[in-house]
């Protein structure tokens, strides 16, 4: 090993504090007992090494549960480089536990945006410093930032003017990072992108980006939409948020939720779980919706369906769950009660118009908890600066539900890497139903569930295979 390569491997990580590694390892061991899907996949595939030769760039919240995912990919033969997909979501002891084992991980809680985009670049560098080296051949993404970086960077190689007019602080930092990279290596993005077989995407927002690029004919590689696996969206998005939302609010504020009016913006899977959690603690839950079907669902569940304009001066707690921008705008916050709590559990920070508050006085109560003081002296409490409250102010979803999501991710990585000819470049796929059902089966024993088996006559009568899949793709669950 030459000196340059040796130096790269010896320093190929950036975490907050390596002394936290032992603590992180203890929590990883506990999480493994709660993640039967990933552990079963290790047992099934470790000897076969289906990911041998895979170089996986991972951009996903660097939590204890993610550490179990990373080590599952490695157990199946993959090389992995990892960064968080959110500046506040890293658990520093989890990152340290991976780093001391030799995993190149670049993440700390409370990153600057400049650091965030620097680290997102670093996870594409599998080769020795100072050489072209190898890039990844797989991306595991959450929110689509790693995928976006490759696509925007490649386009900017031909037209730097694409970077001339950033519309947010996030874009300002992203565009600056791309300009800096192109200044020293004008073909870096196209070289790295050319090696990528495909991407597996974790969340609704990232899938939306992929579908837009696919429809426009600009998606550079194959993609599997993990989010729309039933055992992801109907479990992680619903049951995960049902537990982690109130965990974040409680840790941040110690507020009594019972008796409060809580306004949940959006009634998709995340909104449903959030509304259930708040109602379980005896809040009066109101819902805002644009979709008449979702609005009717909320009403039939007993929630009051209102507009944000109606709720703004009446509710005590506001939660955005939509994946859209400007859901809570300045005029809404200006109308809110003194000490209203405002937070977001959608992927990006633009659901709440935080930028409109920058000219006001901010008083940090503690990390990720701020009083925003309006000119009339009124204060609202903003959590995680409008980013994911469950990861910014708490530790995210429980291990068990993340086992289901991450089992889908691992299976999707195996599918794309081992069978790329079955997937067209530029198209977005979901995993087939039998694999979705497999993920569910892997988790039944842990919760003590007993599965009824069809008889031959029953299977013939309803026209399904005895061992599944049991439902058509159109079934909504």
UniProtKB/Swiss-Prot annotation:
Binding site for substrate: 63, 142, 202, 232, 236
Localisation: Cytoplasm
Pathway assignment: Amino-acid biosynthesis; L-homocysteine biosynthesis; L-homocysteine from S-adenosyl-L-homocysteine: step 1/1
Top-tier EC class: hydrolase
Main location: cytoplasm
Superkingdom of this protein's organism: Bacteria
Keyword ATP-binding found: no
Alphabetic keyword roster: Cytoplasm, Hydrolase, NAD, One-carbon metabolism
Record-annotated membrane-spanning stretches: none
GO molecular function: adenosylhomocysteinase activity
UniProt binding sites for NAD(+): 203-205, 237, 266-271, 289, 324, 345-347, 390
Cellular component terms (Gene Ontology): cytosol
EC number(s) on file: 3.13.2.1
Cofactor binding note: Binds 1 NAD(+) per subunit.
Annotated disulfide bonds: none
Reactions catalysed: S-adenosyl-L-homocysteine + H2O = L-homocysteine + adenosine
Function description: May play a key role in the regulation of the intracellular concentration of adenosylhomocysteine.
The protein's name in its UniProt record: Adenosylhomocysteinase
Species of the source: Leptothrix cholodnii (strain ATCC 51168 / LMG 8142 / SP-6) (Leptothrix discophora (strain SP-6))
């Amino acid at each position: 090993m030459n000196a340059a390569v040796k130096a790269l491997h010896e320093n190929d990580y950036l975490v907050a504090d390596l002394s936290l590694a032992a603590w992180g390892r203890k929590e990883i061991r506990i999480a493994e007992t709660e993640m039967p899907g990933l552990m079963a996949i290790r047992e099934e595939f470790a000897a076969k090494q289906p990911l041998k030769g895979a170089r996986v760039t991972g951009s996903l919240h660097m939590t204890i549960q993610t550490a179990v995912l990373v080590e599952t990919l490695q157990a199946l033969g993959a090389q992995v480089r990892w960064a968080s997909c959110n500046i506040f979501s890293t658990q520093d002891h989890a990152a340290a536990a991976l780093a001391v084992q030799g995993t190149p991980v670049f993440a700390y809680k409370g990153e600057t945006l400049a650091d965030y985009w620097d680290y997102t670049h670093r996870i594409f560098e599998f080769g020795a410093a100072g050489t072209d080296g190898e890039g990844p051949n797989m991306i595991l993404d959450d929110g689509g930032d790693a995928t976006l970086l490759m696509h925007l960077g490649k386009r900017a190689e031909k037209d730097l003017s694409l970077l001339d007019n950033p519309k947010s602080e996030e874009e300002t930092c992203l565009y600056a990072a791309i300009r800096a990279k192109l200044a020293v290596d004008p073909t870096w993005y196209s070289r790295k992108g050319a090696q990528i077989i495909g991407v597996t995407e974790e969340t609704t927002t990232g899938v939306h980006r992929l579908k837009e690029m696919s429809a426009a004919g600009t998606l550079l590689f194959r993609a599997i939409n993990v989010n729309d696996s039933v055992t992801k969206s109907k479990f992680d998005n619903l049951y995960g948020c049902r537990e982690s939302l109130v965990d974040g609010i409680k840790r941040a504020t110690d507020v009594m939720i019972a008796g409060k009016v809580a306004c949940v913006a959006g009634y998709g899977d995340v909104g449903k779980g959030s509304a259930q959690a708040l109602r379980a603690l005896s809040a009066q839950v109101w819902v805002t919706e644009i979709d008449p079907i979702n609005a009717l669902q909320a009403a039939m569940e007993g929630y009051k369906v209102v507009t944000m304009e109606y709720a703004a001066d009446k509710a005590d707690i506001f939660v955005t769950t939509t994946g859209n921008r400007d859901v809570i705008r300045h005029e809404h916050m200006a109308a809110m009660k003194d000490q209203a709590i405002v937070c977001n559990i959608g992927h990006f920070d633009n659901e709440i118009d935080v930028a409109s508050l920058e000219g006001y006085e901010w008083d940090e109560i503690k990390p990720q908890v701020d009083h925003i003081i309006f000119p009339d002296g009124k204060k609202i409490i903003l959590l995680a600066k409008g980013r994911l409250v469950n990861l910014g102010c708490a530790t995210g979803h429980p291990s068990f539900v993340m086992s289901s999501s991450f089992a889908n991710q691992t299976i999707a990585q195996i599918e794309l890497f081992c069978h790329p000819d079955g997937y067209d470049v530029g198209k977005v796929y979901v995993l087939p139903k039998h694999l979705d059902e497999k993920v569910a089966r892997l988790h039944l024993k842990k919760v003590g569930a007993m599965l009824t088996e069809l008889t031959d006559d029953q299977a013939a009568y309803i026209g399904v295979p005895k061992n599944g899949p049991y439902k058509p793709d159109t079934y909504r669950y």
